[in-house]
């Protein structure tokens, strides 16, 4: 994908969350957003997803400007698959229904086609036996895999992951990261907010570190993680890799 952001700013009340964020990637397959909590990573991701509007600035995906008007955003959101840290599954629906509902209601799939699509993806993710269970009957890892399955069922142009393993224990975290890495290997483009530095190093083409609402450092993993140029980056990595 080609991704460009110019002077993105976003405030919530009196709090300035993004301060003139600029990105320019001619070709990036996997972008990891890292940095301290409250740095603006998730807000930037939500703007890319069309779930938040910037107060100022512009965003382009593959040379197409994202127009932040509701009519345009409805079309944009349909092309983006987003996976949140809290799963965001419908608690009253089964695993299967959590996938078929958006296919039918948002993407206008016929019910039979939606069901076949969902069953195929559940089989691929080794979740077929859980298709009629509610989210409450599933483990955290299973719920997150359902959320990922729902995101890719729409055949998105871009996948967005917002700290998808932050609520999981280490063993389940590894399971979910393996799924994400498989999707990367299959050629899906995605942007990933993560605190998993080892994983970011392995899967990302580019890494951007945000702190205080600004891009502090941006480049390939070998630069940002192995030979950081910014003192803020060095301090962040020293803290997160200490234990």
Q: How should each PLM-predicted stretch be described?
A:
Residues 1-5, 9-212, 216-221:
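ABC family nucleotide-binding domain
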Residues 218, 222-243:
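C-terminal boundary and immediately downstream tail of ABC-type ATPase nucleotide-binding domains
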């Amino acid at each position: 994908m080609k991704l460009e952001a110019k002077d993105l700013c976003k405030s919530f009340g009196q709090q300035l969350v993004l301060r003139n964020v600029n990105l320019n990637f001619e070709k990036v397959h996997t972008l990891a957003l890292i940095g301290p909590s409250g740095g603006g990573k998730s807000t930037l991701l939500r703007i890319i997803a069309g779930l938040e509007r910037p107060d100022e600035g512009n965003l382009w995906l593959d040379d197409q400007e994202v127009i932040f008007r509701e009519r345009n955003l409805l079309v944009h959101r349909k092309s983006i698959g987003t996976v949140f840290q809290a799963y965001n599954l419908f608690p009253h629906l089964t695993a299967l229904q959590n996938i078929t509902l958006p296919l039918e209601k948002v993407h206008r799939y016929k019910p039979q086609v939606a069901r076949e699509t969902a069953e195929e993806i559940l089989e691929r993710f080794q979740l077929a036996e859980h298709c009629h269970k509610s989210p409450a009957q599933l483990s955290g890892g299973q719920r997150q895999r359902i959320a990922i399955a729902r995101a890719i069922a729409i055949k998105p142009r871009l996948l967005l992951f917002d700290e998808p393993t932050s609520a999981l224990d280490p063993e389940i975290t590894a399971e979910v990261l393996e799924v994400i890495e498989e999707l990367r290997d299959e050629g899906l483009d995605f942007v990933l907010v993560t605190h998993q530095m080892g994983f970011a190093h392995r899967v990302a083409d580019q890494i951007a570190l945000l702190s205080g609402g600004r891009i502090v450092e941006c480049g390939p993993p070998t630069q940002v993680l192995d030979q950081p140029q910014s003192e803020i980056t060095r301090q962040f990595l020293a803290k997160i890799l200490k234990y």
